[in-house]
C-alpha cells in the first residue's frame, strides 16, 4: 500500500491539525454514525476490538502458564499440552485480526479518488490505529516467548553444570539446540558426560519446549510482518493525531468550564438587574410620596 502521509500533511487551506482531530475523534466508541455504510464499517471495527481483547487476554494467560512451567522441574505433559494449545489459540486469533484488518483497509482506488473525503481519512486513521495496536500486542507476545526461551536455555545450562557437563560451551549448546531433534540433542550430551536420568529428562523436556517456542515465534512473526512496515511509516502521523485528540479534549473541558462560569455570571447579572430595578422603583415611589406630601402641605 502506497504511503501518502506527506499528502495528508500538506492538506488544503484548512489546518491539518484541526482536520486530523475531527477525523480521529471518530476512532473512539460513541462516534457519530454517518450512514449505513459507516454503520457496517463501525461494526467491523467493534468486532476487531473484541477479537483483540480476546487475544490480549490469551497473551496474559500464556505469560502466567509459562511462569508456572518454569517453576516446575519436570512439568506434566498436560501442562505442556495446555501451553501449546494456548499458543495455537493465540495464532488463530492473530490470523483472525489480520483478516479483519485487511477487510477494513481502504482500497487503493478508493483512497486515491476520495483522498480528501473525511470518511476515507477516518477509515485510514482507524485502520492505522488498530494495526498499530495489533503489532504492539504481537510484538509483546513474541518478546515474552523469546524471554521464556532464554530462561529454558538457562535451565538446561544449569543442569549441565550440575551434572558435571560444564565442558559444553554456549556455542556448542546452541548448535545442539538447533539440531531440531531431541534424540540428537540428548545423544550429543551423553557422549562425554554422565548425566542422571532425572536431569536428562528435564533437559530433554526443556529442549522440546524450546523447539515448540521457536516454531510459535516464527509463525506469529509471519502473521503481522505485512503490517509492521506500514505501521512504522504511519506511526508519526498516528502519534500526532493522538496528541491532537488529547489537546482537543483538554480544550473542550476548559471550554465547558468557561461556559459554566459564564452561565453563573449571567445568573448573577440577572439578579443584580432585578435588585437595581427594585431599588429604582422604591426610590421613585419615595420621591413621588415626598412630592405629593409637599404639594398637599403647600
From Swiss-Prot:
Tissue-wise expression: Expressed in the outer and inner hair cells of the cochlea.
One Pfam family from the record: Syntaxin
Residue intervals annotated with topology Extracellular: 296-298
Major location (coarse): membrane
Gene from which the chain derives: Stx4
Membrane topology: Single-pass type IV membrane protein
Superkingdom of this protein's organism: Eukaryota
Region (Interaction with CENPF): 154-298
SUPFAM superfamilies the record matches: t-snare proteins
Chain positions with Phosphoserine modification: 15, 29, 36, 117, 208, 248
A GO cellular component entry from the record: dendritic spine
Side of membrane Cytoplasmic, spans: 1-274
Name by which UniProt lists this protein: Syntaxin-4
UniProt entry tagged with the keyword Protein biosynthesis: no
Quaternary structure and interacting proteins, as annotated: Interacts with STXBP6. Component of the SNARE complex composed of STX4, SNAP23 and VAMP7 that interacts with SYT7 during lysosomal exocytosis. Found in a complex with VAMP8 and SNAP23. Detected in a complex with SNAP23 and STXBP4. Interacts with VAMP2. Interacts with SNAP23 and SNAPIN. Interacts with LLGL1. Interacts (via C-terminus) with CENPF. Interacts with DOC2B. Interacts with STXBP3; excludes interaction with DOC2B and SNAP25. Interacts with STXBP4; excludes interaction with VAMP2. Interacts with STXBP5L.
Residues at the site labelled Required for neurite tip localization: 290
Cellular localisation: Cell membrane; Cell projection, Neuron projection; Cell projection, Stereocilium
UniProt cross-references to InterPro entries, sorted A to Z: SNARE (IPR010989), Syntaxin (IPR045242), Syntaxin/epimorphin_CS (IPR006012), Syntaxin_N (IPR006011), T_SNARE_dom (IPR000727)
Functional note: Plasma membrane t-SNARE that mediates docking of transport vesicles. Necessary for the translocation of SLC2A4 from intracellular vesicles to the plasma membrane. In neurons, recruited at neurite tips to membrane domains rich in the phospholipid 1-oleoyl-2-palmitoyl-PC (OPPC) which promotes neurite tip surface expression of the dopamine transporter SLC6A3/DAT by facilitating fusion of SLC6A3-containing transport vesicles with the plasma membrane.
GO biological process: cellular response to oxidative stress; cellular response to type II interferon; cornified envelope assembly; intracellular protein transport; long-term synaptic potentiation; positive regulation of cell adhesion; positive regulation of cell migration; positive regulation of cell population proliferation
Cited SMART domains: SynN (SM00503), t_SNARE (SM00397)
Domain t-SNARE coiled-coil homology, chain residue ranges per copy: 200-262
Residue ranges the record marks as coiled coil: 38-163
Amino acid at each position: 500500500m502506497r504511503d501518502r502521509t506527506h499528502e495528508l500533511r500538506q492538506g488544503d487551506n484548512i489546518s491539518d491539525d484541526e482536520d486530523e482531530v475531527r477525523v480521529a475523534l471518530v476512532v473512539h466508541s460513541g462516534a457519530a454514525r454517518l450512514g449505513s455504510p459507516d454503520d457496517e464499517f463501525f461494526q467491523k471495527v467493534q468486532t476487531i476490538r473484541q477479537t483483540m481483547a480476546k487475544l490480549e487476554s490469551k497473551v496474559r494467560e500464556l505469560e502466567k502458564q509459562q511462569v508456572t512451567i518454569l517453576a516446575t522441574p519436570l512439568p506434566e505433559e498436560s501442562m505442556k499440552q495446555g501451553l501449546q494449545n494456548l499458543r495455537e489459540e493465540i495464532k488463530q486469533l492473530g490470523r483472525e485480526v489480520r483478516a479483519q484488518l485487511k477487510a477494513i483497509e481502504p482500497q487503493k482506488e478508493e483512497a486515491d479518488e476520495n483522498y480528501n473525503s473525511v470518511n476515507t481519512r477516518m477509515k485510514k486513521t482507524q485502520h492505522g490505529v488498530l494495526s498499530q495496536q495489533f503489532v504492539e500486542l504481537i510484538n509483546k507476545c513474541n518478546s515474552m516467548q523469546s524471554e521464556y526461551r532464554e530462561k529454558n536455555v538457562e535451565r538446561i545450562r544449569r543442569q549441565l553444570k550440575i551434572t558435571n557437563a560444564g565442558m559444553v560451551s554456549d556455542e556448542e549448546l546452541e548448535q545442539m539446540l538447533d539440531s531440531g531433534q531431541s534424540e540428537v540433542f540428548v545423544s550429543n550430551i551423553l557422549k562425554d558426560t554422565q548425566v542422571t536420568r532425572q536431569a536428562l529428562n528435564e533437559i530433554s523436556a526443556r529442549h522440546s519446549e524450546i523447539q515448540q517456542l521457536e516454531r510459535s515465534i516464527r509463525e506469529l512473526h509471519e502473521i503481522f510482518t505485512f503490517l509492521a512496515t506500514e505501521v512504522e511509516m504511519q506511526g508519526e502521523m498516528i502519534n500526532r493525531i493522538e496528541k491532537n485528540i488529547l489537546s482537543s479534549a483538554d480544550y473542550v473541558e476548559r471550554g465547558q468550564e468557561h461556559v459554566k462560569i459564564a452561565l453563573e455570571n449571567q445568573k448573577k447579572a440577572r439578579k443584580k438587574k432585578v435588585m437595581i430595578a427594585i431599588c429604582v422603583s422604591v426610590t421613585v415611589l419615595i420621591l413621588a410620596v415626598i412630592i405629593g406630601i409637599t404639594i398637599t402641605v403647600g
